């Protein structure tokens, strides 16, 4: 599957699950703390579709490329949770790819350990910054 098609599918499913800015942030913060979605009030069917896409080893190379590009984008908008949180409100693509990063490393779908560690570190740093910002406000 072509990179843009994967990205479009992921964005579509994520927007079905988390249609508002607050739902996105809640989802990101809750996935950071748990491997279940019981504390997230979003439709689970689109999330299951995202998981199925990320589980497909043939698509993981493209997904990883997209994820790395989005990590670079997130890094460029600033290190504070406030900037990242506001960035997600106007950019659904980084928000969904950010959550896909979570699925890739947390559920062990990604086999390349170097990429897994880079993605894990980036995810945790960004999620921690956003959670800290939300807890302060």
From Swiss-Prot:
InterPro entries referenced in this protein's UniProt entry, alphabetically: DUF1951 (IPR015271), MG354-like_sf (IPR035947)
Positions of disulphide bridges: none
Alphabetical list of Pfam families matching this protein: DUF1951
Protein name, entry field: Uncharacterized protein MG354
Species per Swiss-Prot/TrEMBL record: Mycoplasma genitalium (strain ATCC 33530 / DSM 19775 / NCTC 10195 / G37)
């Amino acid at each position: 599957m072509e990179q843009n098609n994967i990205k479009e599918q992921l964005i579509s499913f994520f927007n079905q699950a988390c249609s508002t800015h607050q739902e996105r942030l809640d989802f990101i913060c809750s996935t950071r703390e748990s491997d279940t979605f019981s504390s997230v009030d979003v439709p689970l069917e689109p999330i299951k579709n995202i998981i199925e896409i990320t589980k497909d080893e043939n698509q993981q190379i493209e997904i990883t490329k997209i994820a790395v590009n989005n990590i670079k984008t997130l890094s460029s908008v600033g290190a504070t949770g406030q900037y990242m949180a506001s960035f997600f409100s106007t950019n659904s693509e980084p928000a969904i790819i950010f959550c896909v990063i979570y699925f890739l490393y947390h559920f062990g779908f990604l086999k390349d350990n170097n990429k897994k560690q880079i993605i894990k570190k980036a995810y945790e740093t960004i999620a921690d910054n956003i959670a800290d910002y939300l807890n302060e406000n």
